């Protein structure tokens, strides 16, 4: 810890929460530039208490600084950037580098607070919690006992100045915040950042780390209203993953628990609920309760007022929905979630009489959104909007094995992700679309008919579309048809899925 602080020269500046001098340190931009080029995250290690090798880091910095000075900055132009040259330099490049460096600098105080907070405390270190599927066992265990659900879309900030204003409560360095405000206003195409769709696309493509920092900070401020519930409910579970800042903010919110409890003391009577669960992924969150819709209406009213008063955001009606889990399906992480009644009948035999007892239990159900998947395949030009398979002319120049392998990999990824559904029969339609699209692409390449290619390839084409479970079934029963692979119809949650792959992305 002390070596890391001395290396970053924070001993003197940390006393007054000044991070402004670090912006002028050259190695900060070398770290930021190297992290972007290598696609790695410097501060996000497997364990926070694991000391990195400073010798390796110093060698990396020296190499990156030398490489940066030797590179020609005019090669960094992009098509949609209009380079503004000042004294022969690309100013857009330096805007981007300062954004990347600022993201590194601002994370340093948060990182040091997290490390100091975790000193002497045991934490569960599990990479499995980063998997998207790790949240579904929790939903399966808890949501079957709940009735009402508040479906929330976290609103985007109407202006980035609001983010700067909220950031000043954490980073108490006016000079750094003024510099951030200056570059946000001077950044090219500033007006395009005001549109929510362009906001995420623009930053995620240009300055991914900086976008994550600003957006996660906005979400962290929004989630601060749930801190006071930790003392009121032992069932409140907060699952955060993937982003370094989210974990810092979660531990920091635990420290501020007493403060928020005092501030919200007058509202505890209205929101006290022993069966209240909160789950979020990116900009979508759920607040589920066992009580009737009265509590959900109170939460909806409170959230709308909180957004308007604290973030100056007018909440649109479509941002918050109150759903009954037994009557509605909710779209979350590529699944349709619902709670349905599962009827069961028990025969009771007494001495002389026997009678039937009808019983119904609640069951958490996960369905495959087949309409949404067909829409994705339609955008990727594998089929039309009705689900009729189409050829892929762009891939006609590839070899036959590459074409078959690409189609098979797309289906295996989709089947792998939706293995948690009990009704996997919906995936057979996706397999049909991709198989026929593959056959039509091959027929188009060789200027032949689809029937002749299916007859020529036979099982060779089918094997590429087998999942792991179907391969085991096929090897065990080689004479069985591939479409009858119903060896196991239960849910399978994989703990190695960290993102949802776009069907159009084939890399």
UniProtKB/Swiss-Prot annotation:
Keywords: Chloroplast, mRNA processing, Plastid, RNA-binding, tRNA processing. GO terms for cellular component: chloroplast. One of its GO terms (biological process) is RNA splicing. GO terms for molecular function: RNA binding. Disulfide bonds: none annotated. InterPro entries: Domain_X, Maturase_MatK, Maturase_MatK_N. It is found in: Plastid, Chloroplast. Belongs to the intron maturase 2 family. MatK subfamily. Usually encoded in the trnK tRNA gene intron. Probably assists in splicing its own and other chloroplast group II introns. This is Maturase K. The lineage of its organism: Eukaryota, Viridiplantae, Streptophyta, Embryophyta, Tracheophyta.
